Amino acid sequence: MLNQDRIDIQESVAEPVYGAGVWHFATYVDRYATDGYGEPRTILDAIKLAGEVGDLSVLDLNWPFPPGDITTAEVRRALAEQNLRALAVTPEFYTGRFAKGGFTNPDPAVRRQAIDLVAASAEVGRELGVDYVKIWPGQDGYDYPFQADYTDLWGKSVDALRELAQSFPDLKFAVEYKPREPRNRMVFSSVARTLLAIEDMGVDNVGVLLDFGHSLYGGETPAEAARMAIARDKLFAIDVNDNFRGWDDDMVVGSVHLLETFEFFFALDDAGWQGVWQLDQFPFREDPVEAARTGIRTMRAFHQALGYLDRDELAAAQAAQDALGAQRIAKRALFRALAESESA
């Protein structure tokens, strides 16, 4: 088969569905600019901005809906006006009242509040027809040696998620792991630990949300992490961004780790994974609409590059562990697609 024939076959594959976290269009603060980088926005404002992107189809929504007095009906109407759909809900059980943990809080009353908040978000998710409830237990972990009983933290986390999964068997729960921040060490800190926890839960409707940036600065190879989750049929969702591997910078896709991001999407495609390609970018100082368009343009180039990739040649190079040959094959496809994308 000629290379061009292979390209034509690959290019006929349907384009992915593109999504974003609604927080991509929010106003951000940090510990220095506590007054924020711009005017405050409600979730309705953010949804309207998302509609301006033009290539987004779905959104992941924080819940309770910021700033907290907005109804599900209002959000559903705002989504419909922008021709968008709710992909997921992300319950905010990582705020100040959960400073010592959500699922792992030493106070059983606060632990119950966290579980109940996630359950309430799942009910909202049902109303909106989401694909999954995203679980990001940002406050579940520890900060100092000797602070916590690690077995206790693990058990409380597993038990809470098992309870939720069994209470909502019709919904999927996607656990977004992260090595640290806001806690110095988090319970679900890697793909391996998260998969092991899911195994301990013994339920079918809990899986992994693989955030590319979390995987990077957690010392993983994101493509390898994706393969591990897919092999166990547990990769429920992805978030895509970039960073300098030292922190969760949430930069625009492909800004730093261009080749590794392409390898990540190749791993997904090669394994037949067909989920949403979702942005999780934090454009603190950039225009959020343009940042989303830039991220999608880059992801579209990655998708095009998958069609240009000579897979037989790549497989032969990988079988021989020919590092330079494999990189040359990947770069040839990627740089062609990027050049076409940036000149369009």
What kind of region is each of these model predictions?
Residues 16-22, 57-61, 86-91, 133-135, ...:
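Hydrophobic faces of well-ordered beta-strands that scaffold small-molecule active sites
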Residues 4-6, 44-51, 72-79, 118-122, ...:
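Generic structural signal for well-ordered alpha-helices
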Residues 270-318:
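A contiguous, mid-protein "functional segment" used to position or interact
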Residues 2-12, 81, 85-86, 97-207, ...:
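Active-site acidic/histidine proton-transfer and metal-coordination neighborhood
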Residues 1-120, 126, 203-205, 300-344:
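N-terminal pre-domain/capping segments
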Residues 53-56, 128, 168, 271:
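Structural motif
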Residues 23-25, 62-66, 91-94, 138-140, ...:
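Active-site beta-loop-alpha junctions enriched in small/polar residues
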Residues 26-41, 105, 148, 184-195, ...:
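Gly/Pro-rich active-site loop or hairpin
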